């Protein structure tokens, strides 16, 4: 049982409804965005590879930018959306997600899906790190050398949907754990 499951059980003793992502929101597959499209400034962009190597559970700033002309043809990411990777060289990394909490629309490209929803974005991004999600994505993944979980397949993933106030309380607790863990790691490395 994950920490999220424990918190849901504690905060919602009557249980919660599980719903497919495709019912909770809309999953929009990105298209094309090689790193050669990056510019010094312009429209914020998150490349799927950066979700593995640079971003944590959420972010308010992008590391990369593309021209407005390039951005016009890419998948739009609005504040509160979650970007989920579709492709990886291993099962562990496919489906890694980052919640976009910035104040402007940004873009993403291929090998990523934008999840547009009305839930707490950080709750979704945290839930996409759970063993429950891992078990479901394992069944939906295809490929051997390159693993893929399509946007269509992600629509079938079922997740718990507690009330928004419970989602926010779970996020508050998990954020606190994340902060404490980072502080402890910093002290151990010092």
Give the ranges of each region predicted by the language model:
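Sequence-specific dsDNA recognition surfaces
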Residues: 22-35, 49-81
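Short, solvent-exposed loop/turn positions at domain surfaces
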Residues: 10, 32-33, 70-71, 101, ...
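Non-catalytic DNA-recognition/assembly elements of restriction-modification systems
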Residues: 7-31, 190
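Short amphipathic alpha-helical linker/capping segments at the junctions of internal repeats
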Residues: 104-106, 187-190
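A short glycine-rich beta-alpha junction/loop motif
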Residues: 105-111, 142-162
């Amino acid at each position: 049982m994950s920490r999220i499951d424990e918190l849901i059980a504690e905060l919602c003793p009557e249980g919660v409804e599980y719903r497919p992502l495709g019912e909770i929101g809309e999953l929009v597959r990105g298209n094309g965005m090689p790193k050669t499209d990056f510019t010094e400034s312009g429209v914020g962009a998150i490349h799927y590879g950066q979700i593995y190597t640079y971003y944590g559970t959420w972010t308010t700033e992008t590391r990369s930018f593309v021209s407005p002309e390039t951005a016009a043809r890419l998948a739009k990411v609005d504040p509160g959306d979650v970007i989920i990777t579709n492709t990886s060289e291993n099962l562990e990394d496919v489906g890694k997600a980052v919640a976009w909490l910035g104040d402007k629309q940004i873009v993403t490209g291929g090998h990523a899906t934008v999840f547009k929803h009305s839930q707490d974005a950080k709750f979704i991004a945290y839930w996409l790190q759970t063993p429950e999600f891992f078990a479901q994505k394992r069944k939906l993944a295809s490929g051997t050398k390159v693993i893929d979980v399509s946007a269509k397949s992600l629509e079938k993933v079922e997740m718990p949907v507690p009330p928004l106030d419970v989602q926010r309380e779970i996020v508050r607790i998990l954020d606190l754990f994340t902060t404490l863990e980072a502080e402890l790691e910093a002290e151990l490395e010092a």
